[in-house]
């Protein structure tokens, strides 16, 4: 299986369980890997034979600006569902990190991996 990757995607999102986290959006950094089956796009040179990474970035940015999440795990799960559902990818790995959230720690976050069968 081939993989599309999106690295160091930064976006502001409403995420957190503490009252102070709910006052304003926080900047997150996402690392995304999307499985694409076979070599159809490489042979056809047609965007319709792959996952359009620009559309994924736009869709994620819209979701992160609009929705609120308590946990990074829930946010990552939601995004994985978009990739496997709307974009029909068979597999996705998403890492979501809060930047500078904990003193002396540059990033803290989660990584999830889902297939079309296991994503919600």
What are these regions (language model features)?
Residues 1-120:
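N-terminal, polar/charged subdomain of small-to-medium soluble alpha/beta proteins
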């Amino acid at each position: 299986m081939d993989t599309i990757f999106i690295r160091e995607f930064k976006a502001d999102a409403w995420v957190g369980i503490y009252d102070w986290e709910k006052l304003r959006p926080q900047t997150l950094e996402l690392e995304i890997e999307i499985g694409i089956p076979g070599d159809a796009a490489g042979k056809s040179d047609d965007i319709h034979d792959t996952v359009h990474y620009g559309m994924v970035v736009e869709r994620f940015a819209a979701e992160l600006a609009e929705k609120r999440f308590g946990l990074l795990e829930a946010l990552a799960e939601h995004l994985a569902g978009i990739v496997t559902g709307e974009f029909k990818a068979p597999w996705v790995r998403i890492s979501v990190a809060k930047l500078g959230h904990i003193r002396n720690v540059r990033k803290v976050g989660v990584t999830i991996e889902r297939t079309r069968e296991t994503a919600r």
